[in-house]
């Protein structure tokens, strides 16, 4: 959670053009923490769903995550309300149900308010994306607090269009 706190506090000012060295240090440290967390705990459904999307349309990984994460968070908050409550608060939100909205507001502040459709994904791609998600991202799916099936993943892709 420290990485999220640091990113929320410092990345918007850097995106706006600040050259503040302490902010750069904080964002760099947050990135390091993120890498250690991924190495130790793995990733969850947003990454699992993003990899097929970036594979089919050569989407930049961060943009794919930006399109998918708020939608997946909205669907997942009931599976880990305390965790999502903490994330929402770190991003300036106040309620568990509002975590997806807090993520959306943060993404807007850093110019990453995107949809999969803006990245070239269409509704016709969803069956392929869904099947490939389950082929290549089983660990990410299993690691996510909300257990999902193909129908749920397809719906989440559709909502992210």
Regions inferred by a protein language model and the residue ranges of each:
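Active-site segments that bind and position negatively charged phosphate/pyrophosphate groups
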Residues: 1-102
């Amino acid at each position: 959670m420290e990485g999220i706190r640091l990113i929320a506090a410092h990345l918007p000012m850097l995106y706006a053009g600040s050259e503040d060295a302490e902010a750069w240090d904080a964002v760099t440290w947050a990135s390091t923490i993120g890498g250690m967390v991924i190495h130790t705990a793995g990733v969850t459904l947003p990454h699992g769903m993003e990899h097929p999307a970036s594979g089919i349309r050569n989407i930049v990984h961060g943009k794919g995550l930006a399109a998918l994460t708020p939608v997946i968070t909205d669907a997942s908050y009931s599976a880990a309300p305390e965790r999502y409550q903490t994330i929402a608060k770190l991003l300036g939100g106040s309620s568990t149900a509002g975590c997806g909205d807090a993520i959306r507001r943060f993404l807007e502040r850093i110019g990453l308010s995107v949809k999969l459709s803006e990245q070239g994904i269409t509704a016709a791609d969803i069956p392929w994306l869904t099947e490939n998600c389950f082929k290549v991202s089983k660990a990410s799916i299993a690691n996510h607090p909300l257990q999902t099936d193909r129908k749920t993943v397809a719906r989440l892709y559709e909502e992210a269009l």
